[in-house]
Protein backbone atom coordinates (compact mmCIF):
# COMPACT_ATOMS: atom_id res chain seq x y z
CA UNK A 1 0.00 0.00 0.00
CA UNK A 2 1.47 3.36 -0.98
CA UNK A 3 0.76 6.68 0.73
CA UNK A 4 1.41 10.09 -0.77
CA UNK A 5 2.14 13.38 0.95
CA UNK A 6 2.98 16.83 -0.42
CA UNK A 7 4.93 19.47 1.50
CA UNK A 8 6.06 22.89 0.36
CA UNK A 9 8.83 25.33 1.22
CA UNK A 10 9.55 28.76 -0.15
CA UNK A 11 11.82 27.09 -2.68
CA UNK A 12 9.90 24.04 -3.85
CA UNK A 13 6.99 21.66 -3.49
CA UNK A 14 7.98 18.20 -2.31
CA UNK A 15 5.96 15.09 -2.99
CA UNK A 16 7.11 11.78 -1.61
CA UNK A 17 5.71 8.27 -1.34
CA UNK A 18 6.26 5.46 1.09
CA UNK A 19 5.06 1.88 1.36
CA UNK A 20 2.96 0.90 4.36
CA UNK A 21 3.26 -2.74 5.51
CA UNK A 22 0.08 -4.78 5.05
CA UNK A 23 -0.14 -5.49 8.80
CA UNK A 24 -0.59 -1.79 9.62
CA UNK A 25 -4.22 -1.13 10.54
CA UNK A 26 -6.40 1.94 10.16
CA UNK A 27 -5.94 4.46 12.97
CA UNK A 28 -2.23 3.74 13.39
CA UNK A 29 -0.03 6.80 13.92
CA UNK A 30 3.31 6.82 12.12
CA UNK A 31 6.22 9.19 12.60
CA UNK A 32 7.79 9.90 9.23
CA UNK A 33 11.12 11.58 8.46
CA UNK A 34 11.88 12.59 4.89
CA UNK A 35 15.23 13.80 3.56
CA UNK A 36 15.72 14.71 -0.08
CA UNK A 37 17.66 16.82 -2.54
CA UNK A 38 15.96 18.22 -5.63
CA UNK A 39 17.39 18.62 -9.12
CA UNK A 40 18.83 22.00 -8.10
CA UNK A 41 20.63 20.45 -5.13
CA UNK A 42 18.28 22.11 -2.66
CA UNK A 43 18.06 19.97 0.47
CA UNK A 44 14.92 19.25 2.41
CA UNK A 45 14.38 17.44 5.66
CA UNK A 46 11.18 17.26 7.65
CA UNK A 47 9.21 15.27 10.20
CA UNK A 48 5.50 14.52 10.26
CA UNK A 49 3.14 12.55 12.46
CA UNK A 50 0.47 10.90 10.35
CA UNK A 51 -2.65 8.96 11.33
CA UNK A 52 -3.65 6.49 8.65
CA UNK A 53 -7.15 5.94 7.40
CA UNK A 54 -7.22 2.71 5.42
CA UNK A 55 -10.38 1.81 3.55
CA UNK A 56 -11.30 -1.87 3.27
CA UNK A 57 -10.47 -3.50 -0.04
CA UNK A 58 -12.67 -6.19 -1.58
CA UNK A 59 -11.01 -8.15 -4.35
CA UNK A 60 -11.01 -11.33 -6.40
CA UNK A 61 -8.28 -13.78 -5.41
CA UNK A 62 -5.74 -15.11 -7.88
CA UNK A 63 -7.80 -18.26 -8.47
CA UNK A 64 -10.45 -16.08 -10.13
CA UNK A 65 -13.18 -17.43 -7.85
CA UNK A 66 -12.69 -16.52 -4.19
CA UNK A 67 -13.71 -13.04 -3.01
CA UNK A 68 -11.61 -11.67 -0.17
CA UNK A 69 -11.27 -8.46 1.81
CA UNK A 70 -8.30 -6.66 3.30
CA UNK A 71 -8.59 -4.19 6.16
CA UNK A 72 -12.28 -4.93 6.52
CA UNK A 73 -14.59 -5.19 9.51
CA UNK A 74 -17.81 -7.17 9.76
CA UNK A 75 -20.57 -5.20 8.06
CA UNK A 76 -18.32 -3.50 5.51
CA UNK A 77 -19.49 -3.81 1.91
CA UNK A 78 -17.72 -3.70 -1.42
CA UNK A 79 -18.29 -4.33 -5.11
CA UNK A 80 -16.46 -7.10 -6.96
CA UNK A 81 -17.25 -7.83 -10.62
CA UNK A 82 -20.53 -5.94 -10.34
CA UNK A 83 -21.78 -7.79 -7.25
CA UNK A 84 -22.16 -6.20 -3.82
CA UNK A 85 -20.58 -8.28 -1.06
CA UNK A 86 -20.84 -7.97 2.73
CA UNK A 87 -18.04 -8.91 5.13
CA UNK A 88 -19.22 -11.15 7.96
CA UNK A 89 -17.86 -12.59 11.18
CA UNK A 90 -18.53 -15.68 13.28
CA UNK A 91 -21.87 -16.37 14.85
CA UNK A 92 -25.33 -14.89 15.04
CA UNK A 93 -24.68 -11.22 15.75
CA UNK A 94 -25.87 -8.43 13.48
CA UNK A 95 -23.09 -9.15 10.98
CA UNK A 96 -22.65 -12.82 11.83
CA UNK A 97 -22.48 -15.36 9.04
CA UNK A 98 -25.46 -17.33 10.33
CA UNK A 99 -27.58 -14.19 10.64
CA UNK A 100 -27.06 -13.17 7.03
CA UNK A 101 -27.42 -16.71 5.71
CA UNK A 102 -30.71 -17.08 7.56
CA UNK A 103 -31.83 -13.82 5.91
CA UNK A 104 -31.05 -15.27 2.48
CA UNK A 105 -27.90 -13.24 1.81
CA UNK A 106 -25.19 -15.46 0.33
CA UNK A 107 -22.98 -12.78 -1.32
CA UNK A 108 -20.70 -12.80 1.68
CA UNK A 109 -17.00 -12.25 2.18
CA UNK A 110 -15.98 -14.68 4.88
CA UNK A 111 -12.33 -13.70 5.32
CA UNK A 112 -12.97 -12.91 9.03
CA UNK A 113 -14.79 -16.18 9.71
CA UNK A 114 -13.07 -19.03 11.56
CA UNK A 115 -16.14 -21.09 12.53
CA UNK A 116 -18.63 -22.34 9.92
CA UNK A 117 -20.04 -25.17 12.03
CA UNK A 118 -23.78 -25.82 11.53
CA UNK A 119 -24.08 -22.96 9.03
CA UNK A 120 -26.42 -24.90 6.72
CA UNK A 121 -27.47 -27.65 9.09
CA UNK A 122 -31.06 -28.73 8.36
CA UNK A 123 -31.33 -26.18 5.52
CA UNK A 124 -33.24 -28.69 3.43
CA UNK A 125 -33.96 -26.36 0.49
CA UNK A 126 -30.58 -24.61 0.32
CA UNK A 127 -28.66 -24.91 -2.96
CA UNK A 128 -27.13 -21.49 -3.59
CA UNK A 129 -23.74 -20.61 -5.08
CA UNK A 130 -21.22 -20.11 -2.28
CA UNK A 131 -18.10 -21.06 -4.22
CA UNK A 132 -16.68 -17.54 -3.78
CA UNK A 133 -16.54 -17.83 0.02
CA UNK A 134 -13.10 -17.32 1.55
CA UNK A 135 -12.49 -20.27 3.86
CA UNK A 136 -8.76 -19.72 4.27
CA UNK A 137 -9.10 -18.83 7.97
CA UNK A 138 -11.78 -21.36 8.86
CA UNK A 139 -10.85 -24.05 11.39
CA UNK A 140 -14.27 -25.57 12.17
CA UNK A 141 -16.68 -27.01 9.58
CA UNK A 142 -18.43 -29.42 11.94
CA UNK A 143 -21.90 -30.42 10.62
CA UNK A 144 -21.74 -27.54 8.14
CA UNK A 145 -24.05 -29.19 5.57
CA UNK A 146 -25.63 -31.84 7.77
CA UNK A 147 -29.14 -32.64 6.49
CA UNK A 148 -28.78 -30.02 3.72
CA UNK A 149 -30.57 -32.49 1.49
CA UNK A 150 -30.83 -30.22 -1.60
CA UNK A 151 -27.28 -28.90 -1.63
CA UNK A 152 -25.05 -29.84 -4.54
CA UNK A 153 -23.01 -26.67 -5.00
CA UNK A 154 -19.52 -26.47 -6.45
CA UNK A 155 -17.20 -25.74 -3.52
CA UNK A 156 -14.11 -27.41 -4.91
CA UNK A 157 -12.06 -24.20 -4.88
CA UNK A 158 -12.36 -23.70 -1.12
CA UNK A 159 -9.11 -23.32 0.81
CA UNK A 160 -9.43 -25.79 3.69
CA UNK A 161 -5.79 -25.74 4.74
CA UNK A 162 -6.56 -24.51 8.27
CA UNK A 163 -9.61 -26.66 8.95
CA UNK A 164 -9.22 -29.12 11.83
CA UNK A 165 -12.81 -30.34 12.24
CA UNK A 166 -14.90 -31.76 9.37
CA UNK A 167 -16.94 -34.13 11.51
CA UNK A 168 -20.37 -34.94 9.98
CA UNK A 169 -19.82 -32.13 7.50
CA UNK A 170 -21.92 -33.75 4.75
CA UNK A 171 -23.87 -36.17 6.89
CA UNK A 172 -27.26 -36.79 5.21
CA UNK A 173 -26.46 -34.27 2.47
CA UNK A 174 -28.13 -36.80 0.22
CA UNK A 175 -27.57 -35.22 -3.23
CA UNK A 176 -24.12 -33.70 -2.74
CA UNK A 177 -21.67 -35.10 -5.28
CA UNK A 178 -19.11 -32.43 -6.14
CA UNK A 179 -15.38 -32.77 -6.74
CA UNK A 180 -13.53 -31.80 -3.56
CA UNK A 181 -10.45 -33.83 -4.36
CA UNK A 182 -8.19 -30.77 -4.28
CA UNK A 183 -9.07 -29.85 -0.70
CA UNK A 184 -6.11 -29.63 1.67
CA UNK A 185 -7.07 -31.74 4.70
CA UNK A 186 -3.58 -31.96 6.17
CA UNK A 187 -4.66 -30.29 9.43
CA UNK A 188 -7.97 -32.09 9.86
CA UNK A 189 -8.12 -34.23 13.00
CA UNK A 190 -11.84 -35.11 12.96
CA UNK A 191 -13.60 -36.59 9.93
CA UNK A 192 -15.96 -38.81 11.88
CA UNK A 193 -19.20 -39.43 9.94
CA UNK A 194 -18.16 -36.83 7.38
CA UNK A 195 -20.14 -38.51 4.58
CA UNK A 196 -22.56 -40.59 6.63
CA UNK A 197 -25.75 -41.15 4.61
CA UNK A 198 -24.43 -38.88 1.83
CA UNK A 199 -25.97 -41.32 -0.61
CA UNK A 200 -24.99 -39.65 -3.88
CA UNK A 201 -21.36 -38.92 -3.09
CA UNK A 202 -18.90 -41.04 -5.06
CA UNK A 203 -16.02 -38.67 -5.86
CA UNK A 204 -12.36 -39.65 -5.70
CA UNK A 205 -10.91 -38.10 -2.54
CA UNK A 206 -7.89 -40.37 -2.25
Which stretches of residues belong to each language-model region?
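Conserved small/polar residues in nucleotide/adenosyl-binding loops
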Residues: 1-5
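Aromatic sugar-binding surface patches on proteins
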Residues: 8-19
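Extracellular recognition modules
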Residues: 17, 31-37
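Short, surface-exposed loop/turn segments at beta-strand-coil junctions that are enriched for proline
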Residues: 19-26
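Exposed beta-strand face motif in extracellular beta-rich ectodomains
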Residues: 26-32, 106
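Short, solvent-exposed loop/turn segments at the edges of extracellular beta-sandwich modules
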Residues: 37-43
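Extracellular and select intracellular beta-sandwich modules with Ser/Thr-enriched
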Residues: 43-49
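Negatively charged
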Residues: 54-206
Amino acid sequence: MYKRQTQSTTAAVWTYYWQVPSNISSGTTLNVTATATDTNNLPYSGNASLTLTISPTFYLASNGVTVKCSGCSAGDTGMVSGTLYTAVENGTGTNGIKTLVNAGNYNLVTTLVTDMSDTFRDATSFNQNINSWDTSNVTNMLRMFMNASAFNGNIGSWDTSNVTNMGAMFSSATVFNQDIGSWDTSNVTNMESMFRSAQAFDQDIS
